[in-house]
Amino acid sequence: WIMGHMVNEIYQIDEFVDLGANSIETDITFDDDAMAEYSYHGVPCDCMRWCHKWEYVNDFLEGLRRATTPGDSKYRKQLILVVFDLKTGDLSSSTAYKGGKLFAEKLLRYYWNGGSNGGRAYIIISIPDIDHYAFISGFRDALKKSGHEDLLAKVGYDFSGNDDLNSIRSALHKAGVKDREHVWQSGGITNCLLRSLDRVNEAVKNRDSSNGYISKMYYWTIEKYATGRDALNAEVDGIMTNYPDVIVNVLNEDSFKNRFRMATFDDNPWELFKR
């Protein structure tokens, strides 16, 4: 999965898919009542990126729905996975549940179209703070109570704060998520800084172990050819990048073209890939 980073305006969906992304990451901010308000990152953000692009969440979700609904004039077949980077910093552990409930209701209305012919992309809800695990509980409960528990088949989970893996596993369990139940694990740092592959290697080892909790592992934010090669050699499942075309080119190199391919809609993002 090539994951286009910081896609916060509707026009950027086409921009990143045109560059080769089959997945995008979108930042979501919340108001004082725990309601998702904007697709917006703000400062600081990655080097060489404009941090202030935004849409109202409802508008972005409708644009995203069109881009991922077969038959729509805006449909982009390649776009199969969306990561919502949830900026929950202004939520408390007590309001996180409410935030998850309200976000699920918003997705149900504006993205899944009330459960009728909505967007088909798989969704990852990515939370930076393991203390906000109740966001996941609220999200799951809202879909169950609305009679749309079936949509949870399209939803995965990630804690993105680079916490200790055992602590993340514990937070997932508290949220009601079992080991390998649609669990993506991120690892990385802003492109402005350097980071070793230690975190990636630890997560990949967990993913591939008989008693791990991780289904897929992705690395962020990659810019350079050399770093892309290192990530693929570490056998990650996804790469988040500001330059999808760079990763496409790396995948086409002799060293990788017979080992990896781009994921399609027929590839289940929750299944552990046996290497």
UniProtKB/Swiss-Prot annotation:
Cite the cofactor comment.
Binds 1 Mg(2+) ion per subunit.
Report one GO cellular component: extracellular region
> Where Mg(2+) is bound, by residue?
25, 27, 85
Q: What is its EC number?
A: 4.6.1.-
Q: Which residues form the active site?
A: 5, 41
The record's listing under Gene3D superfamilies reads:
Phosphatidylinositol (PI) phosphodiesterase
Secreted as UniProt keyword: yes
Protein name per the record: Dermonecrotic toxin LamSicTox-alphaIV1i
